[in-house]
Amino acid sequence: MKAWCSYTLGTALFLLGSLPTFAQRPPLIDETVPPASDHYPLPADAKPIAGVAAGTTFKFEMTDSKIFPATARTITVYVPAEYKGDKPACVYVGLDSLGFNAATVFDNLIAQHAMPITIAIGVSSGDVASATPPDNPRFDRSFEFDSRSDRLARFLLEEVLPEVERHTTADGRAIKLSTDPNDRAIGGGSTGAIAAFTVAWERPDAFRRVFSAIGTYVGMRGGEQYYVLVRKTDPKPLRIFMQDGVHDEWPGGPEMGDWWMSNQTMNRALGFAGYDVRHTWGTGTHNGNQAASLFPDAMRWLWKDWPAPVRAMEPGNPVLKAILRPGEDWQVAADGCASVTTLAANQKGQVFYPAQGAPEVSEIVAGGKPVLCSQPAAAAPFAFGADGRVYVARTEGGVTATDQAAHGPANVLGQGLNIGSLTVCNNGDIYAVTRENELWLIRANGEKVRLDKDLKGASGVALSPDGLWLFVAQGLSRTGLSYRVRSDGTVDAREAYYDFYVPTWADDSGAAGIGMDRDGRAYVATRMGVQVFDRNGRVAAILPLPGNAAGTGLCFGGHDFDTLYVASGGKVYRRKLHVTGAPPWAVPFKLPPWGAG
């Protein structure tokens, strides 16, 4: 037995000794980078100043959140001495509570009239106790702060701020907070910094001024996508101050990314996109020393010119410049539309949608909704043809084609097909996707040809303006499909060609309607608003909808087909663009030259 043990141990040691060992990485030395220094003395405005009245601070616990269930956290509220309680004050939200000597800085700057009277609210991240406290609690900080979603914004707006207003100061002053986004700022350090940016990014209708120190714009929970999203998205009315140091790296997770490089990349993206952004870089590591030293100047800059509103700037993205008209924004075209999933325009550019609960398709016009056709069309998909007829999907299957005045005979095509979306070509052929996730060609003579099956939530279909390619949207996927259109109308060469951006809280794009412009770009209504694709299947621009709502239907319309209509949340929005739409029923034409790049 001893011999066996001796042999086995010896063999094991021999084998272990023969295993490869990791080479030691030489230290990364860049002689152009100054040595690390975290010595940043506080300026006078970050220290108490004689004769300046100090504000009051109180705290309370929050343990009853519905958005972050079972969490416990501390809320800290600073109320300046100048606040009288007779009218709403401006708001600053500090994430990870009130850092950077915020109360003292605000005392001094408010006294100097360098910033408005502002109530500051420090919000710590939540913890969830285990079933056997204090053992192994769940720390929600990364989930709440690093996530690229609107959860934290909703938590602040729906739960924290209302709870703060239910309190009073020790001397009985009521807490009244302004609801004007121009009166609200938010800031934080590290994970609190990306959280502050995310809140303002998701809800620019609630926060417009952002302070970001040593921001965690890395691969924690999707933050590394911000550099690209900022470049591609229609600029929002935000002002951002950024701080970081050349030696910034969080020692607890360097595998997540490079803090210093990510902050520079984020700053460059914001500058490219057209934001009002300022930065100060230093020589520090991952701490708040430099941020605390410059916090007074950052607040002065963020609040400069107040109460003049923070406005969205001209985009730097060349695609956004090409398609957007300066000064044109989303306008409500129709309200009270219930759940609209189909929008379509006729040859005059008049835009119609299915009237919920009524047997007609209705036009979007000011002061009325005239009946378009008397066929059963309540909430049914429909499209217009080059022949002037409207093609409406029937609940019993197939498509009814009738003239818009409903005087001519109705033809039934594609009987037996449970159609979810359709488009009518110039030659009268119909491409349709069914609720069974199949793609069909319905020829003008009534012949049906199944082209594909096993789609993922097929939700839209569009033909390129030259008639050579077919785009099929899949609402339950992260990709859209491209097909080559053959001379007989059938298709081949299927590829998952279109890559959508998907919110971190969703599993799919929710793509639900496609329009094409005369340059060959595709516009798709999605969970993230309208995503604009170039001809190589890449998202080149994103147009968020009001309230960051999802789009559920889309088309070009207007007299010159230069207005984009998008259905969303019971409303239909319109936005006049600098490009012209290419209706599916139009005569195909040759597109401008394009390359493989």
What are these language model-derived features?
Residues 24-312:
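Non-catalytic cap/lid and distal C-terminal segments of serine-dependent acyl enzymes
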Residues 310-329, 491, 584-585:
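Blade/loop signatures of beta-propeller domains
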Residues 356, 395, 435-436, 475, ...:
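Short loop/turn segments immediately following the C-termini of beta-strands
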Residues 360-401, 408-416:
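Blade-loop segments of beta-propeller domains
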